[in-house]
């Protein structure tokens, strides 16, 4: 069979993938000692293979943090997310953070900020527009991008690449924990007050009930201030989430509204934690439209 009339090309950008190390962190002796190299994967639109040449030298960029209950991540599990956004015309930088078993809070938010600064430091080589950078994360990654985005260049922080800013244009939070002090107020399958639960481990292996001040310090909602600028934020949460209660997003949305912050909230009615609903084209379209309007 010969196809003669091919019609018009309507495919999106082909995507190149490569991996780098964005920082080497020292691990304290209490958590085993030594050091760890933290990788970051870049997904970049490829112009050379486009049927019509386009004069683009720098792309809007999304730094993505994959959720893991603050434990070890399997970053490339979300390959479909990264590629499906990158092919629409974004650089996606998917980072690995230190897991809570070797470095509890505030390690993850510090790693996220360091990754943003690394992207800015190497912007020309990576074809990144330094003035158009957003954060996106799911679950504990959502918590991390909220922490990092709400605090920007203020603490908790590190001095790695400190000559570059960690501030971002927008944040996309998919079903992240927003108030660690209130996780057990609503039904879920986790014991979030236990030292052995994800939040207890993130706080250093302690009980949330015994250390409410530390739990509050690790909660993104704590860092909202009326007189401090906050990046526009898109919240998306599944109505059937049994891991992170839907109310966590409600609490954040309500607080941001009270403080006059720019925030959008989308409920995926039958969405569960990280699966049904979030891998659909509709969800990707929502993310893309939000990024287009804020980057």
Residue ranges and their predicted role:
Residues 1-295:
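Alpha/beta-hydrolase superfamily serine-hydrolase fold, recognizing
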